[in-house]
């Protein structure tokens, strides 16, 4: 069972649903990245384009032991890639970390973080149609 989302997401946070049924949150901008992080639990998975600017994506899990299928990891990575500096490439390198290892930096712009422990880094295809396919009412 997945944790329910709070009613009324902030305007700057987009909701997607992976084909495996996981809720995926993506910030629309720096403030949206901050808002998405605040909605996440320590055991949720955080994704971001490697070595450059982009949106944060959160994969919500019911608990820390809940496995996330490869397809969901790739789809969430694709959503991160579509709103990153790698959006025009064929593939993008995405980093993955548990939220407990993602820390906001003080005295910096909203959405700037430090990652203490990355558990994966992988290339995913950049597919802009993915955004439409994973919308909740698509």
Please describe what each predicted stretch is.
Residues 1-138:
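Duplex nucleic acid-engaging cores and interfaces of nucleic-acid transaction enzymes
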